[in-house]
Regions:
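A structural-propensity feature for long, helix-poor, extended segments
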Residues: 104-118
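Beta-rich nucleic-acid/ligand-interaction surfaces
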Residues: 88-106
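Helix N-cap motif at beta-to-alpha junctions
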Residues: 64, 125-128
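Short, surface-exposed ligand-recognition loops at beta-strand->loop->(often short) alpha-helix junctions
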Residues: 60-66
Length: 239
């Protein structure tokens, strides 16, 4: 509760605060990094030991960039208001079965130490079990996209650096001022002003009636691995 205003905490019943804390603890007790935990439910006193007029979202994921922002964006896209958001990063040790062995001091390092992000949110109440499941699935898909982008961020940045270097040597039929503007823009992107999410490579092959755009399936990085351009034959011809 470190990031929650005291005024908000004092408005909650102690039993509900204890209940949601124990619920999050149960999520933390066992974890497989290959299968991030996402749970969306309507707290019920009989089932969960606490209650809320909102739906609860519990998330446990290996700590990587963009997690919180991605959750917010997906919930906003679906029209859910966020009433409570708690996010904590833990340094932990687990055994080979994923069972929690130790919570270490913040930022602790070591070969057997994992950094894990635990999130708890309360959002507009979902009206049915089906809606809860749909939201769980949507958040899992969002995290899958985040992992793709994070895993390939450095390779995508390297591709951008290659392109920037190529511009210094390329003999292009464009005005010098225009080419210089492109170079400056590429350098600005590479100076940590842009988050690379996906990469796809196209080449142009000459043909008798003009040219053809060739889509390199092996070039895909980041989100492009799941969100492909999917050019149709009519889209690849250049007159």
């Amino acid at each position: 509760f470190g990031i929650i205003a005291l005024e908000e905490l004092t408005q909650r019943r102690l039993s509900d605060l204890v209940g949601c804390t124990l619920s999050s603890w149960r999520v933390l007790e066992r974890f497989d990094a290959a299968k991030p935990e996402v749970r969306v439910f309507n707290p019920d006193y009989e089932k969960h030991g606490w209650q809320s007029t909102h739906s609860a979202v519990e998330i446990l994921h290996s700590d990587i960039p963009f997690l919180v922002d991605s959750v917010r964006m997906e919930l906003n896209r679906r029209g859910y208001s966020i009433h409570t958001l708690q996010n904590s990063v833990f340094s932990v040790r687990r055994n080979k079965n994923g069972e929690l062995q130790e919570i270490l001091s913040k930022g602790a390092q070591g070969a057997d130490v994992q950094q894990e992000a635990l999130m708890f949110l309360e959002i507009d109440r979902c009206s049915s079990a089906g809606e809860l499941k749909v939201l769980e699935k949507a958040l899992q898909e969002v995290f899958s996209d985040v992992r793709l982008s994070v895993a390939d961020f450095q390779p995508m940045k390297a591709k951008a650096k290659e392109l920037r270097a190529w511009l210094d040597k390329a003999k292009l039929k464009v005005e010098g001022a225009e080419l210089e503007e492109v170079k400056v823009f590429m350098s600005w992107l590479l100076d940590d002003h842009f988050t690379f999410l996906g990469y796809e490579e196209f080449t142009v092959a000459d043909s008798a009636d003009g040219g053809t755009i060739v889509y390199d399936e092996k070039s895909l990085l980041g989100l492009s691995k799941s969100l492909r351009t999917g050019l149709k034959a009519d889209d690849t011809h250049i007159e």
